């Protein structure tokens, strides 16, 4: 039987990006947010990326003694979290104002196209091109490679990205998790409402899907996290983007299966203002918003071929920015 909710089990998660391969930036991000006090860090299921994340965590552990759990993201099918953008730069007219370059939050676009390692699939560039030259492609770990990857990486936790209508595929992924016998502290199930379907999905559809997945996971005896993905990978960094996650939590939070509840998908520094202090989730996950405020500092270090933590003053500034960003979730009302 899966353990039920422990009211003291509150946490903050940093999302580095399920398709983010920017190893140098990931090392810096993990160092910064480990120092700032996050409880989990979620990265792509790739050995070199996990190695970079651990290097950043280890640096901060020596100085700040915090030790977040390491989570990897996997998917049971095609998913917007597992994509990248591409275009042929030879087709760009010389006179183009390059709106794609201006909207990219990770500076992945230049005159040579899109740097694969820096693109995490946010989608902001897809509709910015006046000639519609930019397309997306899938970047995902195959089910055939999942077991061996888990055994090599040995993460503390796994997050399975799923969609309402993918129960069979979800079942196969869980079967692989069972077979590889990797010891996990938690399993997170990330799902939201996919409005690209011909028939709009409703919160009750999501609730039914999560209970179906609970029945499949119930025999594993591993604590579960239900991640309500409000506005997944919208590419929108406006303060109001967190409303969808909060509304979803208010609608179905009390009826979810046993486990812990986490908000994601558009979460940012304003999310706490939208929540009722008497009805808070167990966890909060930050992706684009947490990375965006660090990107200029990280880019400065990388231009000079250094890690950000090799600049003590700038690293100190980055940690203070991260602490301020996380401050509402570190307060007694949340923790």
Regions found by a protein language model. Give the residues of each.
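Glycine-rich, positively charged N-terminal anion/phosphate-binding segment
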Residues: 27, 46-64
